[in-house]
Design a protein with these regions (language model features):
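N-terminal small-domain helix-loop-helix segment of the aminotransferase-like
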Residues: 4, 8-101, 108, 292-294, ...
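Generic structural signal for small/hydrophobic residues in well-ordered secondary structure
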Residues: 18, 35, 55, 79, ...
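Conserved core of the PLP fold type I
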Residues: 57-204, 216-233, 358-360, 408, ...
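Short beta-strand
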Residues: 32-34, 242, 330-336
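Conserved core segment of the aminotransferase class I/II
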Residues: 52-53, 78, 232-310, 314-325, ...
Length: 418
């Protein structure tokens, strides 16, 4: 049946393909440690009790009609206070937009500042920027990053592509790597954006800067989150922040995200979100507004969540470092933030016991699913070249025990390759 050219040519998700393989094996009765999806198992990581009860209370209070187009005022006021208290960012409620999770905010940012044919610059690996470019018929410029920089882009890597671009889209802590910008590196990128905008006339669109910090509350050890506006306040007119409750409160299904930035851009995004009907449910907004200003309760929840996530990430990292020490061609980058660990499994060209040659990272992944009963996501799903044998491991849907038990299976599976 004939459909639109856009729908016909839109690329599917490699993660969904992997999920299909896992589901088929589960249907056959196999137990797979699924480290693919960037989500939480809510039986392992439930949302805060106070937030859950607040949602129930809001429904009992009949908070079930349409919310305001830009979000419930009480929530925008609470977000404003949350940003000031936790990140030192000063944004008024009229500079804040609420939506059903952060995804509509990213898409509406693209729609608000990018025209067909415009250049959008983003790093590889990164999450979904290539698909948003496809939807808008924008010219996506994927800048390949390097392991020695923790797969975070540098100003020197971005600079050759910035001239004339409409949008620079960055994320820290980064999905899929779980790594973060160091202060100096982000400062250099900020200075590059400032310099580029000084070359543009009043009749030209500036270079806008989308900064996704949905994982900003999930950092580990001495790793500190930095943002462009704190480092360079003169960027405030150009930076659109993406943030929300999904990751820091294990509330991916609650669907409350917030974006903030220049009032004019936010107003345009509000109209776009309204036409899409991508609002967050009103009851959830009311409950979130009350919860996020409870600083003691928020701190207690975050401390516990971060501690448990870090234990799982460290377990996987330490397991891979031991495999590396044992002579296996693997590596990992120490966890810095988010719920992800970056893994290297460099077995391209090896042959399985069944005689199949592993030609790329996808082949390696599907081999491990079948032989080691564990699933990752190759960086090729996030825009890197197929021959880059690095992977994302997401620990939010597995227990610490699942991860501990998986390491010996990985070792056994890799030892079988010739």
């Amino acid at each position: 049946m004939k459909v639109s050219a856009l729908a016909e040519n839109l690329r599917g998700s490699e993660i969904i393909k992997i999920a299909g393989e896992i589901n088929e094996l589960k249907r056959q009765g196999q137990n797979i440690a699924n480290l693919t999806i960037g989500d939480y198992d809510s039986n392992i990581y439930p949302i805060p009790d106070e937030l859950k009860q607040g949602i129930v209370d809001a429904y009992k209070d009949n908070q079930t009609n349409y919310p305001p187009a830009d979000g419930v005022l009480l929530l925008r006021e609470s977000v404003s206070a949350f940003l000031k208290n936790r990140l030192g960012l000063g944004y008024k409620p009229n500079q804040i937009l609420i939506s059903g999770g952060s995804r509509p905010l990213i898409y509406s940012t693209y729609l608000a500042v990018v025209d067909e044919g415009d250049k959008v610059v983003f790093p590889a690996p990164s999450w979904n920027n290539n698909h948003y470019c496809d939807l808008l018929k924008a010219k996506g410029i994927m800048v390949q990053t390097r392991a020695e920089n923790n797969f975070m882009p540098t100003a020197d890597e971005l600079r050759p592509h910035i001239k004339g671009a409409a949008l620079l889209a960055l994320c820290s802590p980064l999905n899929p790597t779980g790594t973060m910008f160091h202060k100096k590196d982000l400062e250099e990128i900020c200075d590059m954006v400032i310099a580029e905008n000084k070359t543009r006339s009043a009749n030209e669109k500036p270079l806008y800067f989308l900064y996704d910090q949905i994982y900003s509350q999930l950092t580990f050890g001495d790793n500190q989150h930095f943002d462009p506006v704190t480092l360079r306040p003169e960027l405030k007119d150009y930076v659109i922040f993406i943030d929300g409750a999904s990751k820091c409160f294990a509330a991916t299904g609650v669907r409350v995200g917030w974006g903030f930035g220049p009032e004019g851009v936010i107003n345009n995004m509000k109209a776009i979100v309204g036409h899409m009907g991508a609002w967050a449910p009103k009851a959830e907004q009311v409950a979130m507004a009350k919860y996020i200003v409870e600083e003691v309760k928020v701190n207690a929840y975050l401390d516990k969540l971060k501690s448990r996530i870090q234990v799982s990430l460290n377990s996987l990292h330490n397991g891979f470092q031991q495999l590396k020490a044992d002579g296996f061609s693997v590596d990992s980058i120490a966890p810095m933030g988010a719920i992800y660990l970056t893994l290297k499994i460099d077995y391209t060209g090896k042959t399985t016991p069944g005689g199949t040659v592993l030609n790329n990272s996808a082949d390696i992944n599907f081999y491990l699913i079948k032989e080691a009963k564990i699933a990752f996501v190759p960086f090729s799903a996030f825009g890197t070249d197929d021959d880059v044998n690095w992977f994302r491991a997401s620990v939010g849907a597995c227990t610490f025990e699942d991860i501990e038990l998986a390491i010996p299976r990985i070792k056994e599976a890799l030892a079988k390759l010739k």
